[in-house]
Amino acid sequence: MRKKLRAVIIGPGNIGTDLLIKMKRSDWIEPVWMVGIDPDSDGLKRARDMGIKTTHQGIDDFIDYLIADDIRIAFDATSAYVHEENSRKLNALGVVMIDLTPAAIGPYCIPPVNLEEHANNLEMNVNMVTCGGQATIPMVAAVSSVQKVDYAEIIATVSSRSVGPGTRANIDEFTRTTASAVEQIGGARKGKAIIVINPAEPPLMMRDTIHCLLSEDPDEVNISKSVYNMVKEVQKYVPGYRLVNGPIFDGRKVSIFMEVEGLGDFLPTYSGNLDIMTAAALRTAEMFAERVASKAITLPNRH
């Protein structure tokens, strides 16, 4: 029989709520707790209505129940400012932390590029970069796996309505973390990230533009093949991930244009930026659970 790993979601906002709905369908992860700090939080109320245990008194209140409820995975959907303390407390109790903030104190995780490596090493904190990073870094990695990328620039355009207060408070961290991961995981020598929050009504679907500048003339056939294969890999956990145009070659520049449609679990389908983040985080937790079930890794003993 499959053994689900039991999980807590910290942060009952847009991301936390969408993650909870996705987790309810998972074969590998069982959501048990949601932690917030606002007694009037809509997210906590929704979680309670779904049969999830909740507290509005923060992580310290939840920790008292962690061992008894056998919580093994935590998803932090709060803010970069508080993540480090959350992670320190939970890692000390043998909980694997999946960080959906731009704090990036653990290694970056882009599932089709490097998730297996993290799961096999039992990394206790993995960072999901940003929505822009999840949508674009697979494409940079697809190009850099064929030829050296001197410079990569990504532009993530998201609807204003899909961007909650947590993301707005972390815009600088968003651009820095994404650019850093474009280099470290995407394989570009230099990376740059731009986020555009579009207030248009009706809201636009998430759009992502990826420009890669190569150090030599492009191998068009193999780059195209690599990009198409990577799109299929991402579609395994984000079905609405689509190549709109490209790769387009202009001298040594390669341009790729993507859109991301969400599943519409919590926010409407235009919020692909929310979906790709939560789907990638859940895929990451599921890979850890699969490795535990197959005895490839052993979770920390805490009894």
Swiss-Prot record:
Entry protein name: Acetaldehyde dehydrogenase
**One GO molecular function term?**
NAD binding
Q: Does the keyword Membrane apply?
A: no
**What is catalysed by this protein?**
acetaldehyde + NAD(+) + CoA = acetyl-CoA + NADH + H(+)
InterPro entries hit by this protein: Acetaldehyde_dehydrogenase, Acetylaldehyde_DH_C, NAD(P)-bd_dom_sf, Semialdehyde_DH_NAD-bd
GO biological process, alphabetically ordered: catabolic process
Q: Which Pfam families match?
A: AcetDehyd-dimer (PF09290), Semialdhyde_dh (PF01118)
Sorted alphabetically, the keyword list is:
Aromatic hydrocarbons catabolism, NAD, Oxidoreductase
Provide the species name: Marinomonas sp. (strain MWYL1)
Q: Locate the residues binding NAD(+).
A: 162-170, 273
Q: What is its EC number?
A: 1.2.1.10
